[in-house]
Protein backbone atom coordinates (compact mmCIF):
# COMPACT_ATOMS: atom_id res chain seq x y z
CA UNK A 1 0.00 0.00 0.00
CA UNK A 2 1.05 3.61 -0.34
CA UNK A 3 3.17 5.58 2.04
CA UNK A 4 6.68 4.14 2.15
CA UNK A 5 9.26 6.82 2.80
CA UNK A 6 12.58 6.83 1.00
CA UNK A 7 14.30 5.62 4.14
CA UNK A 8 12.03 2.62 4.44
CA UNK A 9 13.05 -0.76 3.05
CA UNK A 10 10.24 -1.92 0.72
CA UNK A 11 8.64 -5.05 2.21
CA UNK A 12 8.95 -8.29 0.28
CA UNK A 13 5.94 -10.39 -0.67
CA UNK A 14 6.83 -12.96 2.00
CA UNK A 15 6.98 -10.25 4.67
CA UNK A 16 3.58 -8.92 3.57
CA UNK A 17 1.95 -12.37 3.66
CA UNK A 18 3.47 -13.22 7.06
CA UNK A 19 2.61 -9.81 8.53
CA UNK A 20 -0.97 -10.00 7.24
CA UNK A 21 -1.50 -13.47 8.72
CA UNK A 22 -0.09 -12.55 12.14
CA UNK A 23 -1.92 -9.21 12.28
CA UNK A 24 -5.22 -10.84 11.30
CA UNK A 25 -4.82 -13.51 14.01
CA UNK A 26 -4.13 -10.84 16.65
CA UNK A 27 -7.21 -8.90 15.53
CA UNK A 28 -9.32 -12.08 15.56
CA UNK A 29 -8.33 -13.03 19.10
CA UNK A 30 -9.21 -9.58 20.45
CA UNK A 31 -12.50 -9.12 18.57
CA UNK A 32 -13.81 -12.71 18.44
CA UNK A 33 -16.57 -12.22 21.06
CA UNK A 34 -18.04 -9.50 18.82
CA UNK A 35 -18.01 -11.91 15.88
CA UNK A 36 -19.75 -14.60 17.94
CA UNK A 37 -22.41 -12.08 19.00
CA UNK A 38 -22.86 -11.05 15.37
CA UNK A 39 -23.38 -14.66 14.26
CA UNK A 40 -25.94 -15.34 17.02
CA UNK A 41 -27.88 -12.18 16.11
CA UNK A 42 -27.76 -12.99 12.39
CA UNK A 43 -28.93 -16.56 12.87
CA UNK A 44 -31.83 -15.13 14.87
CA UNK A 45 -34.94 -17.24 14.46
CA UNK A 46 -33.36 -19.67 12.02
CA UNK A 47 -33.98 -23.31 12.76
CA UNK A 48 -31.00 -25.24 14.06
CA UNK A 49 -31.59 -28.95 13.98
CA UNK A 50 -35.11 -29.41 15.33
CA UNK A 51 -35.13 -26.47 17.68
CA UNK A 52 -35.76 -22.79 17.19
CA UNK A 53 -32.93 -20.80 18.69
CA UNK A 54 -35.29 -17.91 19.36
CA UNK A 55 -37.64 -20.13 21.32
CA UNK A 56 -34.82 -21.09 23.63
CA UNK A 57 -33.23 -17.76 24.27
CA UNK A 58 -33.41 -14.23 22.88
CA UNK A 59 -30.50 -11.90 22.35
CA UNK A 60 -30.83 -8.13 22.66
CA UNK A 61 -28.07 -6.02 21.17
CA UNK A 62 -24.35 -6.60 21.07
CA UNK A 63 -23.56 -6.17 24.74
CA UNK A 64 -26.73 -8.03 25.75
CA UNK A 65 -25.80 -10.97 23.53
CA UNK A 66 -22.28 -11.15 24.93
CA UNK A 67 -23.53 -10.94 28.54
CA UNK A 68 -26.28 -13.53 27.90
CA UNK A 69 -23.83 -15.95 26.29
CA UNK A 70 -21.33 -15.52 29.13
CA UNK A 71 -24.02 -16.08 31.78
CA UNK A 72 -25.92 -18.97 30.17
CA UNK A 73 -23.17 -20.86 28.37
CA UNK A 74 -20.00 -19.59 30.02
CA UNK A 75 -17.40 -17.02 28.94
CA UNK A 76 -15.51 -19.68 26.97
CA UNK A 77 -18.47 -19.91 24.57
CA UNK A 78 -17.62 -16.42 23.31
CA UNK A 79 -14.51 -17.97 21.79
CA UNK A 80 -16.19 -21.08 20.37
CA UNK A 81 -14.80 -21.59 16.89
CA UNK A 82 -11.64 -19.54 17.54
CA UNK A 83 -9.22 -22.28 16.36
CA UNK A 84 -11.09 -22.44 13.04
CA UNK A 85 -11.14 -18.64 13.00
CA UNK A 86 -7.36 -18.48 13.35
CA UNK A 87 -6.94 -21.18 10.72
CA UNK A 88 -9.15 -19.05 8.48
CA UNK A 89 -7.03 -15.95 8.98
CA UNK A 90 -3.80 -17.84 8.28
CA UNK A 91 -5.16 -19.28 5.03
CA UNK A 92 -7.43 -16.37 4.09
CA UNK A 93 -6.29 -12.97 5.37
CA UNK A 94 -2.62 -13.67 4.72
CA UNK A 95 -3.43 -14.12 1.03
CA UNK A 96 -6.09 -11.48 0.41
CA UNK A 97 -4.19 -8.75 2.29
CA UNK A 98 -0.62 -9.94 1.85
CA UNK A 99 -0.88 -10.37 -1.93
CA UNK A 100 -2.90 -7.18 -2.57
CA UNK A 101 0.09 -4.91 -3.26
CA UNK A 102 1.87 -7.51 -5.40
CA UNK A 103 -1.20 -8.17 -7.57
CA UNK A 104 -1.86 -4.43 -7.84
CA UNK A 105 1.69 -3.89 -9.09
CA UNK A 106 1.10 -6.63 -11.67
CA UNK A 107 -1.92 -4.76 -13.05
CA UNK A 108 -0.17 -1.37 -13.08
CA UNK A 109 3.06 -2.63 -14.73
CA UNK A 110 5.16 0.15 -13.25
CA UNK A 111 2.62 2.93 -13.72
CA UNK A 112 0.79 4.81 -10.96
CA UNK A 113 -1.94 2.65 -9.44
CA UNK A 114 -5.43 3.49 -10.71
CA UNK A 115 -8.77 2.81 -9.03
CA UNK A 116 -9.35 0.04 -11.57
CA UNK A 117 -6.09 -1.70 -10.68
CA UNK A 118 -6.90 -1.48 -6.97
CA UNK A 119 -10.37 -2.98 -7.50
CA UNK A 120 -8.98 -5.71 -9.78
CA UNK A 121 -6.38 -6.63 -7.16
CA UNK A 122 -9.05 -6.76 -4.47
CA UNK A 123 -11.29 -8.98 -6.61
CA UNK A 124 -8.52 -11.43 -7.47
CA UNK A 125 -6.94 -11.81 -4.03
CA UNK A 126 -10.34 -11.99 -2.33
CA UNK A 127 -11.65 -14.67 -4.70
CA UNK A 128 -8.61 -16.91 -4.39
CA UNK A 129 -8.50 -16.56 -0.60
CA UNK A 130 -12.21 -17.42 -0.20
CA UNK A 131 -11.91 -20.67 -2.14
CA UNK A 132 -8.87 -21.79 -0.13
CA UNK A 133 -10.24 -20.76 3.26
CA UNK A 134 -13.94 -21.72 2.90
CA UNK A 135 -13.79 -24.96 4.99
CA UNK A 136 -12.46 -23.00 7.96
CA UNK A 137 -15.29 -20.46 7.55
CA UNK A 138 -17.95 -23.20 7.54
CA UNK A 139 -16.58 -24.79 10.73
CA UNK A 140 -16.15 -21.43 12.47
CA UNK A 141 -19.74 -20.35 11.80
CA UNK A 142 -21.21 -23.74 12.78
CA UNK A 143 -19.37 -23.73 16.11
CA UNK A 144 -20.26 -20.11 16.86
CA UNK A 145 -23.94 -20.62 16.09
CA UNK A 146 -24.62 -23.82 18.01
CA UNK A 147 -26.05 -23.49 21.49
CA UNK A 148 -25.60 -26.02 24.28
CA UNK A 149 -28.90 -25.03 25.86
CA UNK A 150 -32.56 -25.95 25.42
CA UNK A 151 -32.19 -28.19 22.43
CA UNK A 152 -30.73 -31.33 20.92
CA UNK A 153 -27.19 -32.44 21.59
CA UNK A 154 -24.69 -30.07 19.95
CA UNK A 155 -23.74 -31.16 16.46
CA UNK A 156 -20.01 -30.72 17.06
CA UNK A 157 -17.77 -31.15 20.10
CA UNK A 158 -14.80 -29.27 18.70
CA UNK A 159 -13.02 -27.91 15.65
CA UNK A 160 -11.61 -31.11 14.20
CA UNK A 161 -14.74 -33.04 15.14
CA UNK A 162 -16.69 -30.52 13.07
CA UNK A 163 -14.41 -30.99 10.05
CA UNK A 164 -14.82 -34.77 10.30
CA UNK A 165 -18.60 -34.80 10.78
CA UNK A 166 -19.25 -32.31 7.98
CA UNK A 167 -17.02 -34.24 5.57
CA UNK A 168 -18.62 -37.56 6.59
CA UNK A 169 -22.29 -36.56 6.60
CA UNK A 170 -22.33 -33.90 3.88
CA UNK A 171 -19.35 -34.93 1.78
CA UNK A 172 -16.34 -32.80 0.98
CA UNK A 173 -18.69 -30.35 -0.75
CA UNK A 174 -20.19 -29.66 2.68
CA UNK A 175 -16.93 -28.00 3.69
CA UNK A 176 -17.37 -25.61 0.76
CA UNK A 177 -21.05 -24.97 1.53
CA UNK A 178 -21.95 -21.31 1.08
CA UNK A 179 -18.97 -20.58 -1.15
CA UNK A 180 -21.12 -18.48 -3.50
CA UNK A 181 -22.49 -16.05 -0.86
CA UNK A 182 -19.15 -16.04 0.93
CA UNK A 183 -17.34 -15.29 -2.33
CA UNK A 184 -19.77 -12.44 -3.02
CA UNK A 185 -19.40 -11.15 0.54
CA UNK A 186 -15.63 -11.30 0.62
CA UNK A 187 -15.17 -9.83 -2.84
CA UNK A 188 -17.22 -6.87 -1.60
CA UNK A 189 -15.34 -6.78 1.70
CA UNK A 190 -11.91 -7.17 0.15
CA UNK A 191 -12.45 -4.49 -2.49
CA UNK A 192 -14.15 -2.04 -0.16
CA UNK A 193 -11.84 -2.63 2.79
CA UNK A 194 -8.49 -2.59 1.01
CA UNK A 195 -9.35 -0.02 -1.66
CA UNK A 196 -10.97 2.38 0.85
CA UNK A 197 -8.06 1.98 3.25
CA UNK A 198 -5.57 2.50 0.44
CA UNK A 199 -7.34 5.58 -0.96
CA UNK A 200 -7.92 7.12 2.48
CA UNK A 201 -4.33 6.56 3.54
CA UNK A 202 -3.05 7.95 0.24
CA UNK A 203 -5.23 11.07 0.55
CA UNK A 204 -4.17 11.74 4.15
CA UNK A 205 -0.48 11.35 3.34
CA UNK A 206 -0.47 13.23 0.01
CA UNK A 207 -2.42 16.17 1.43
CA UNK A 208 -0.11 16.20 4.45
CA UNK A 209 -3.04 15.86 6.86
CA UNK A 210 -1.32 12.98 8.64
CA UNK A 211 2.04 11.29 8.39
CA UNK A 212 2.20 7.63 7.37
CA UNK A 213 2.07 6.41 10.96
CA UNK A 214 -0.34 4.94 13.51
CA UNK A 215 -2.88 7.86 13.56
CA UNK A 216 -3.14 7.71 9.76
CA UNK A 217 -3.57 3.94 9.82
CA UNK A 218 -6.20 4.27 12.58
CA UNK A 219 -8.37 6.80 10.70
CA UNK A 220 -8.08 4.92 7.41
CA UNK A 221 -9.07 1.65 9.09
CA UNK A 222 -12.18 3.16 10.74
CA UNK A 223 -13.43 4.62 7.44
CA UNK A 224 -12.73 1.33 5.65
CA UNK A 225 -14.57 -0.64 8.34
CA UNK A 226 -17.73 1.49 8.14
CA UNK A 227 -17.92 1.46 4.33
CA UNK A 228 -17.32 -2.28 4.26
CA UNK A 229 -20.04 -3.03 6.83
CA UNK A 230 -22.69 -1.03 4.96
CA UNK A 231 -22.05 -2.80 1.66
CA UNK A 232 -21.47 -6.32 2.95
CA UNK A 233 -24.10 -6.71 5.68
CA UNK A 234 -26.96 -8.19 3.55
CA UNK A 235 -24.68 -10.75 1.91
CA UNK A 236 -23.05 -11.55 5.26
CA UNK A 237 -26.39 -12.35 6.90
CA UNK A 238 -27.49 -14.61 4.02
CA UNK A 239 -24.10 -16.34 4.06
CA UNK A 240 -24.30 -16.98 7.81
CA UNK A 241 -27.86 -18.36 7.59
CA UNK A 242 -27.06 -20.62 4.64
CA UNK A 243 -23.77 -21.96 6.02
CA UNK A 244 -25.37 -22.71 9.40
CA UNK A 245 -28.51 -24.34 7.94
CA UNK A 246 -29.36 -28.01 8.30
CA UNK A 247 -29.28 -30.13 5.11
CA UNK A 248 -32.42 -29.39 3.07
CA UNK A 249 -33.46 -26.32 5.06
CA UNK A 250 -32.77 -24.07 2.06
CA UNK A 251 -32.62 -25.28 -1.53
CA UNK A 252 -30.20 -22.57 -2.61
CA UNK A 253 -28.70 -19.23 -1.64
CA UNK A 254 -31.46 -17.25 -3.44
CA UNK A 255 -34.06 -19.44 -1.70
CA UNK A 256 -32.47 -18.61 1.66
CA UNK A 257 -32.57 -14.88 0.86
CA UNK A 258 -36.19 -15.07 -0.34
CA UNK A 259 -37.35 -16.97 2.76
CA UNK A 260 -35.66 -14.37 4.96
CA UNK A 261 -37.38 -11.57 3.05
CA UNK A 262 -40.86 -13.12 3.17
CA UNK A 263 -40.70 -14.33 6.77
CA UNK A 264 -38.78 -11.51 8.46
CA UNK A 265 -38.83 -8.54 6.09
CA UNK A 266 -36.00 -6.41 4.65
CA UNK A 267 -34.61 -5.57 8.09
CA UNK A 268 -33.49 -9.22 8.41
CA UNK A 269 -30.65 -8.47 6.00
CA UNK A 270 -29.19 -5.98 8.46
CA UNK A 271 -29.46 -8.11 11.60
CA UNK A 272 -26.29 -7.82 13.60
CA UNK A 273 -25.27 -4.58 11.84
CA UNK A 274 -23.94 -2.94 15.01
CA UNK A 275 -21.76 -5.89 16.05
CA UNK A 276 -20.69 -6.24 12.42
CA UNK A 277 -19.48 -2.63 12.42
CA UNK A 278 -17.92 -2.91 15.86
CA UNK A 279 -16.25 -6.12 14.74
CA UNK A 280 -15.06 -4.85 11.34
CA UNK A 281 -14.11 -1.42 12.65
CA UNK A 282 -12.12 -2.69 15.61
CA UNK A 283 -10.74 -5.62 13.58
CA UNK A 284 -9.57 -3.25 10.84
CA UNK A 285 -7.91 -0.90 13.32
CA UNK A 286 -6.01 -3.69 15.08
CA UNK A 287 -5.16 -5.56 11.89
CA UNK A 288 -4.01 -2.62 9.77
CA UNK A 289 -2.01 -0.98 12.56
CA UNK A 290 -0.31 -4.30 13.42
CA UNK A 291 0.17 -5.08 9.73
CA UNK A 292 1.88 -1.77 8.97
CA UNK A 293 4.08 -1.91 12.07
CA UNK A 294 5.06 -5.54 11.51
CA UNK A 295 6.08 -4.84 7.92
CA UNK A 296 8.23 -1.91 8.97
CA UNK A 297 9.88 -3.71 11.89
CA UNK A 298 10.58 -6.89 9.94
CA UNK A 299 12.19 -4.99 7.09
CA UNK A 300 14.21 -2.84 9.50
CA UNK A 301 15.45 -6.01 11.19
CA UNK A 302 16.33 -7.54 7.85
CA UNK A 303 18.12 -4.37 6.78
CA UNK A 304 20.08 -4.31 10.05
CA UNK A 305 21.08 -7.96 9.62
CA UNK A 306 22.16 -7.34 6.02
CA UNK A 307 24.29 -4.37 7.11
CA UNK A 308 25.87 -6.42 9.91
CA UNK A 309 26.93 -9.11 7.46
UniProtKB/Swiss-Prot annotation:
Residue numbers of Cysteine sulfenic acid (-SOH) PTMs: 256
Catalytic activity: H(+)(in) = H(+)(out)
GO biological process: adaptive thermogenesis; cellular response to fatty acid; cellular response to hormone stimulus; cellular response to reactive oxygen species; mitochondrial transmembrane transport; proton transmembrane transport; regulation of reactive oxygen species biosynthetic process; response to cold
Segments annotated as Solcar repeats: 11-106, 113-203, 212-297
Top-level lineage group: Eukaryota
A Gene Ontology molecular function term of the record: cardiolipin binding
Location relative to the cell: Mitochondrion inner membrane
InterPro entries: Mit_carrier, Mito_Metabolite_Transporter, Mitochondrial_sb/sol_carrier, Mt_carrier_dom_sf
Binding residues annotated for fatty acid 16:0, in chain numbering: 60, 271
Posttranslational mods: May undergo sulfenylation upon cold exposure. May increase the sensitivity of UCP1 thermogenic function to the activation by noradrenaline probably through structural effects.
Transmembrane segments: 11-32, 78-100, 119-135, 181-197, 215-234, 269-291
Pfam families: Mito_carr
All ranges on the Mitochondrial intermembrane side of the membrane: 2-10, 101-118, 198-214, 292-309
Topology, Mitochondrial matrix side: 33-77, 136-180, 235-268
Subunit annotation: Most probably functions as a monomer. Binds one purine nucleotide per monomer. However, has also been suggested to function as a homodimer or a homotetramer. Tightly associates with cardiolipin in the mitochondrion inner membrane; may stabilize and regulate its activity.
Function: Mitochondrial protein responsible for thermogenic respiration, a specialized capacity of brown adipose tissue and beige fat that participates in non-shivering adaptive thermogenesis to temperature and diet variations and more generally to the regulation of energy balance. Functions as a long-chain fatty acid/LCFA and proton symporter, simultaneously transporting one LCFA and one proton through the inner mitochondrial membrane. However, LCFAs remaining associated with the transporter via their hydrophobic tails, it results in an apparent transport of protons activated by LCFAs.
Protein family: Belongs to the mitochondrial carrier (TC 2.A.29) family.
Protein name: Mitochondrial brown fat uncoupling protein 1
Amino acid sequence: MVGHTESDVPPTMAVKIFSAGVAACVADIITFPLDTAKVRLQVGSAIQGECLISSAIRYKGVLGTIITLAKTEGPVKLYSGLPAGLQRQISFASLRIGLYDTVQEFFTTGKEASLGSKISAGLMTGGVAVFIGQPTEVVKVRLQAQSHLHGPKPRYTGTYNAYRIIATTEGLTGLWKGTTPNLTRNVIINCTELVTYDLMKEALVKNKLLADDVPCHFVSAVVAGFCTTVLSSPVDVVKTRFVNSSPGQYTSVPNCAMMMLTREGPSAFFKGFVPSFLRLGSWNIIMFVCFEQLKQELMKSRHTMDCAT
